């Protein structure tokens, strides 16, 4: 290796970063310095994220008009992509950005069923290039092996061009995890209420971890994901976390605090005169009350207790980084939600004892939240065309993998409602995420795969002008 070659400089940088990473005191000092600097620009960051978010929203009505792609196919593709992200150890923001790219492309172009996995992996590839370290970005050979030789390498490059042109090269979009970090920092640095700020600061790690888990779960359910923006999903996830983990903070006060941020003079000073990005509130109190009802809590228990297989691998693996903590948080959240739905009956003697204890400790109970039994929305997974599974041993290996699965295999159409029609929670009992078998779709013979690869690249994508 030459002393002045780029590889030599890269090795020096890697060695220095490893030395810094092993110094906990240095890391703590850098984090405190970073936090102090970020606090000065939090309002500018909030305004920027909300402005960009309004311009990068997908359209549910257009996605539902896809002739071959059904909403029931979407969770299966996302489950496959999340597993890829976990195995490759990519950043947390890669998954929501990938989902945003997929949905925005499906809002502008017609996608054939056999190209849905190609779209997902190419969107993941684009997200990696924007958010992850260079050495973590998968190569074209890696992508080909991940999809078990279903597509040629040239197809990924071709699909990348189509995505970038269709989205007019607007790749970056605010993700819910960015809003969760910003919301937490805004609350911790809140100078008007030091008591709440200290409570949130003590539990900030648990709040961020569980809020991100809930946000990732919501990505798999179109009726939650499309009914709310990333900023609202992040706020809903934080409110659910505060409620289920029994953090002593009033939810309505917390909601009013975040809605009040967009009305402050510091926030409005970032808005140009005559600009269209005028924000009244992030999530209205009426929307909050209509969402947090018995039906939502009942299905939230099912969602939290039965995550997709990819999230089980990410959060609940035996030797996982957060497996013990996540199991505790999920157990606490489930028990809290069950208590909200079915309160434990108490005797008059027990009630008088509790009241006596509350008076001794000057405890002021939170006023009960009104429960509205009307509706809101989740679409469960249906059995439809599923992405190809892969083995981690196939990635970064020298041996060529054997073609085994093609994404375009014909399967029964997924269950979906007509465009624009609301889906309900009731159908979640019939189909659950964990019951989808993905490894069962195989080619009848190798000639089918050869014919799919010998197609003309110029006619692969039906681009509607």
From Swiss-Prot:
It comes from the Eukaryota. It holds the Pfam family Cyclin_N. InterPro entries: Cyclin, Cyclin-like_dom, Cyclin-like_sf, Cyclin_CLN, Cyclin_N, Cyclins_cyclin-box. Keywords: Cell cycle, Cell division, Cyclin. SMART domains: CYCLIN (SM00385). SUPFAM superfamilies: Cyclin-like (SSF47954). One of its GO terms (molecular function) is cyclin-dependent protein serine/threonine kinase regulator activity. The keyword rRNA-binding does not apply. One of its GO terms (biological process) is regulation of G1/S transition of mitotic cell cycle. Gene3D superfamilies: Cyclin-like. Belongs to the cyclin family. PANTHER family: CYCLINS (PTHR10177). Essential for the control of the cell cycle at the G1/S (start) transition. Interacts with the CDC28 protein kinase to form MPF. This is G1/S-specific cyclin CLN2. It comes from Candida albicans. The gene is CLN2.
